[in-house]
Amino acid sequence: MAAAGEAEPPAAPTARTTLILRRSLGSPALFAIVWTSLASSIYFSLGVVAGHALGLTPLVFLAAGVFFTLTGMTYAEGAALHQDRAGSTVFARYAFNELVSFVAGWAILLDYVILIAIASLTATSYLAAFYAPLGHGAPRLAVALAIIAFVAYSNIRGFSTRRTQRTALIVVADLAIQLLVIGIGLVLYFNLSTITGPIHLGSAPTWSDVVYAFAITTVAFTSLESASGLSGEVTLGPRGLRRLVVSANLSVYVIYVGMAIVAVTAIPVVAGHTALGDRHLGAPVIGIVVRFHPAALADTLKYVV
């Protein structure tokens, strides 16, 4: 028994306490995790997709949104049934066997490597708005490697409440910026004939180009894998899960289709070609906002995006 005046030692954490601490992520945190990759895909894929899909770019992104909905529902169901880390590899093991699980794991790993490489190089293209040499040569490589190193370090440190809050704030700011670009772009440039006029199905674009463009739009869906890998650390009831699925899907449709419409109207397809596919390939969103007017607005948004 403790002597009078002495503080009692803190009680050892019970299994229930540990469980509460561990299962601490809610729907806002998961939305932030999912949206970081989805939002980044607009910044690097818009130019490639527009260069291949041309006037069908909005429809390609709409199809990507439908595919995201189906994929997201699959992940939500799988994560609810099997609350283990590793996402699709766990689902594949339960549904099929260890071999299929192994193949799925390596495919996801390769997808992550591709996404990291593309995102880090694209980031340098946007940073070049502040300092042009960052967009090419050795400076670009050095900055890209530094970004990869920072991401690796952040993932080694793991999640914390502060990091989750910071990520959520960044996601909200990014959503606001993208909605602002969409709103201004639609007011300044929207014209349905500008989108449909250059479309000649089978030739401009070709069906193979449309399929390739659609494949590019799905690269960032690995964010679902990231969120699914945290399924054992979340506190989501049916209502919270429904809110997460609805908000993520609504955001994808609005941002993807909205940005695609603004892209092909602000930088229209001419003679089966768009500047988004070459001149603005590395930083397509900057290519869009520099077309805005007045010039002061374009200059401001150039640095904001």
What are the residue ranges of the model-derived segments?
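Extracellular loop-to-transmembrane helix junctions
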Residues: 21-22, 44-147, 248-258, 301-302
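Juxtamembrane interface elements at the cytosolic ends of transmembrane helices
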Residues: 2-13, 43-46, 72-79, 154, ...
